[in-house]
């Protein structure tokens, strides 16, 4: 699943919390 949305890399979903794009 794609957790990164937009150029800012906003996070959607709890599992995406640990991804770098969500930082």
Swiss-Prot record:
Q: Which UniProt keywords apply?
A: Amidation, Disulfide bond, Ion channel impairing toxin, Neurotoxin, Pyrrolidone carboxylic acid, Secreted, Toxin, Voltage-gated sodium channel impairing toxin
- What's the stated role of this polypeptide? Mu-conotoxins block voltage-gated sodium channels (Nav).
Which positions carry Alanine amide?
23
Name-wise, this protein is: Mu-conotoxin-like SxIIIB
Its chief place of residence is secreted
Molecular function as annotated in GO: sodium channel regulator activity; toxin activity
Query: As annotated in Swiss-Prot or TrEMBL, what is the tissue specificity of this protein?
Result: Expressed by the venom duct.
Task: List the disulfide bonds in this chain.
Answer: 3-16, 4-21, 11-22
| One GO cellular component term | extracellular region
Write out the similarity annotation: Belongs to the conotoxin M superfamily.
From which organism does this entry originate?
Conus striolatus (Cone snail)
**Annotated compartments:** Secreted
Pyrrolidone carboxylic acid occurs at 1
UniProt keyword Thylakoid present: no
The domain-related comment in the record is: The cysteine framework is III (CC-C-C-CC).
